[in-house]
Amino acid sequence: MIIKENSDKQTQIYNFLIEFTKSKGYPPSVREICQAVSLKSTSTVHGHLKRLEKKGLIYRDPTKPRALEIVELSNEEKELIDIPIVGKVTAGMPILATENIEDMFQIPINYVKHNNDLFILKVTGDSMIEAGILDGDLAIIEQKNVATNGDIVVALIENEATIKRFFKENGFIRLQPENKNYEPIIVEDCSILGKLVGIYRAY
């Protein structure tokens, strides 16, 4: 996500903050801001953020370095949807069976494209860190049983759900981690439970 060069850096940064936060559901890091607006110095970005805060456009929590709130977005009326958090996945049982659901989680509806057949799995482990999916994240999944090569999916392998990138090739399915320290999972077949459509991360 790169901001056009036809505005000053402060405006570019503010526009990027809004775009990124609307898209991801959480604010960008200072380094991500640097990359988006072609600045090399993180201290320059911090200076712009201070000026935006003085103007009342953003609010930063001094106790949490990455915690940043965009006042404009906070003031928008947010329609919330409830998404079930699935604690376990069992072969032969519908993913949203009552006994599988641990809790419900509310998120603004604008964080996802729709609220049809969504569920949440809590990410455990670091096998997908190079795709920006971290341990403890809440993975928002659209329930579906088919996938296209390159999709990040939830697959059921030996009665255990795993989040990996999907590839079908040479009569086999490759479930590819996004971490060079992990080997791909190669299987003849597997059950696809859904496709990743969003990540929610608390700071």
UniProtKB/Swiss-Prot annotation:
Active site, renumbered: S127, K164
UniProt entry tagged with the keyword Membrane: no
Record-level Gene Ontology MF annotations: DNA binding; serine-type endopeptidase activity
DNA-binding region as annotated in the record: 30-50
Catalytic activity: Hydrolysis of Ala-|-Gly bond in repressor LexA
Keywords linked to the UniProt accession: Autocatalytic cleavage, DNA damage, DNA repair, DNA replication, DNA-binding, Hydrolase, Repressor, SOS response, Transcription, Transcription regulation
EC class name: hydrolase
Record site: Cleavage: A91, G92
Cited PANTHER family: LEXA REPRESSOR, LEXA REPRESSOR-RELATED
Name the UniProt record assigns to this protein: LexA repressor
Gene: lexA
